[in-house]
């Protein structure tokens, strides 16, 4: 698959041949969905907590005598049915992470990239660099490229000026190639890869 390479200013900068093993697969939404669920589950903090009857502080004294009151028998004020009692089956601190094989994760990334390429949501630029970290200049460049909702992937090192200028633009994410992931690809309308990112991807899946 051949794709045109453009500059940030919108000028043509040649073309690039995309690997069919990475960008030419028939997209499978089920594999992509599995990876997205894995990512979202893994990043959940799991710090929710409610106190059970063994953890709340109430007196341990029997509420009232066993017989002769006409009421139901009760021994503890810590039980869930009373105000101030412990929560029954409440949330506990735990990990929400689920298992997903590494090969499935790698396959999901290739399917997400293929889906973007097939749907016309993939753009390749020669480099993502700015001389001065000016958000206004970058907004103008993005407007010329039609980027209002995009994930931009650079090489191993993201240009400091570019990252600084882009971080204040809504719906624009900038990541180094090490941070590329299925969820961020799916949630953004356009995927922008630099030539350095493209080379790193092909080396990764070689």
From Swiss-Prot:
One of its GO terms (molecular function) is structural constituent of ribosome. One of its GO terms (biological process) is translation. One of the primary rRNA binding proteins, this protein initially binds near the 5'-end of the 23S rRNA. It is important during the early stages of 50S assembly. It makes multiple contacts with different domains of the 23S rRNA in the assembled 50S subunit and ribosome. Pfam families: Ribosomal_L4. It comes from the Bacteria. The keyword rRNA-binding applies. Disulfide bonds: none annotated. This is Large ribosomal subunit protein uL4. Belongs to the universal ribosomal protein uL4 family. Part of the 50S ribosomal subunit. GO terms for cellular component: ribonucleoprotein complex; ribosome.
């Amino acid at each position: 698959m051949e794709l045109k390479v453009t500059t940030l200013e919108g000028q043509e900068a040649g073309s690039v041949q995309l690997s069919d093993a990475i960008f030419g697969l028939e997209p499978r939404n089920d594999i992509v969905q599995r990876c997205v669920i894995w990512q979202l589950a893994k990043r959940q903090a799991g710090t929710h907590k409610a106190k059970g009857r063994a953890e709340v502080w109430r007196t341990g004294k029997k509420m009232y005598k066993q017989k002769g009151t006409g009421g139901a028998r009760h021994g503890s004020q810590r039980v869930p049915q009373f105000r101030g009692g412990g929560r029954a089956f409440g949330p506990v601190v735990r990990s929400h992470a689920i298992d997903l094989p590494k090969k499935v994760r790698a396959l999901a990334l290739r399917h997400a990239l293929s889906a973007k390429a097939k749907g016309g949501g993939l753009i390749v630029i020669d480099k993502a660099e700015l001389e001065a970290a000016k958000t206004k200049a970058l907004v103008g460049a993005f407007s010329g490229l039609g980027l209002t909702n995009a994930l931009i992937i650079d090489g191993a090192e993201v240009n400091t000026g570019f990252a600084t200028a882009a971080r204040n633009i809504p719906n624009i994410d900038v990541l180094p190639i090490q941070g590329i992931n299925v969820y961020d690809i799916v949630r953004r309308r356009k995927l922008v890869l630099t030539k350095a990112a493209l080379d790193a991807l092909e080396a990764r899946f070689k």
